[in-house]
Amino acid sequence: MKYIEVDEELYRLIASKTERIGESASEILRRLLGLEVEASATQEKDEPEVISQPGLEETADVEDKPRFIDLHSSINKEELAAAKGAVGRFLFILEAVYLASPEQFAQVLKIKGRDRLYFATSKQSLLKASKSANPKEIGQSGYWVTTNNNTAKKRTILTEVLHQYGTVEAQIESITRNI
């Protein structure tokens, strides 16, 4: 792997073209330049095979399916507009998601970058993963999120959260535009 130095404007442009969490700069540039992206870099890790256990099949199906929650109606537009900056709006929306279904929120802990931790249950966990994480608590949820990402990355992270909640694409776009 070779390293190159790029100016801030170019870095922001590349970062804004991120399509999924964990996508490397090389993958972004390869995609933008129309070059072949290495298969190993884009493929998800294989999940372990689920072994059927009599009497538990129905429970497993229920847990795997995200429960649809209409988050659009649970976000107070006036309070969102009053939130300070992109970080404030990001935290406000995450708190609204949490309040809509607190028992389902733990799944955000699965959202991670290639070398980055985005959510944790303590400030220390995020700081241990990255000294520059600038962790903030999501309301009074007991969950913490890294906030030193650019706005495009915050939107990508929020998109992943909303996907986990079974939110439809049109709502995801509408909600993430508010950051």
UniProtKB/Swiss-Prot annotation:
Q: Name one GO cellular component term.
A: cytoplasm
Read off the SUPFAM superfamilies from this record. Replication modulator SeqA, C-terminal DNA-binding domain, Ribbon-helix-helix
Indicate where this protein is primarily found.
Answer: cytoplasm
Gene3D superfamilies noted in UniProt: Met repressor-like (1.10.1220.10), Replication modulator SeqA, C-terminal DNA-binding domain (1.20.1380.10)
Disulfide feature? none
Per UniProt, which keywords does this protein have? Cytoplasm, DNA replication inhibitor, DNA-binding
Annotated region described as Interaction with DNA, given as residue ranges: 86-87
Q: Which GO terms describe its molecular function?
A: DNA binding
Localization, per the record, is: Cytoplasm
Q: Name one GO biological process term.
A: regulation of DNA-templated transcription
Q: Which domain of life is it from?
A: Bacteria
Pfam family example for this protein?
SeqA_N
InterPro entries noted in UniProt: Arc_rbn_hlx_hlx, Ribbon_hlx_hlx, SeqA, SeqA_DNA-bd_C, SeqA_DNA-bd_C_sf, SeqA_N
Q: What does this protein do?
A: Negative regulator of replication initiation, which contributes to regulation of DNA replication and ensures that replication initiation occurs exactly once per chromosome per cell cycle. Binds to pairs of hemimethylated GATC sequences in the oriC region, thus preventing assembly of replication proteins and re-initiation at newly replicated origins. Repression is relieved when the region becomes fully methylated.
Subunit and interaction comment:
Homodimer. Polymerizes to form helical filaments.
> What does the similarity note say?
Belongs to the SeqA family.
This one is known as: Negative modulator of initiation of replication
Please name the gene that encodes this protein. seqA
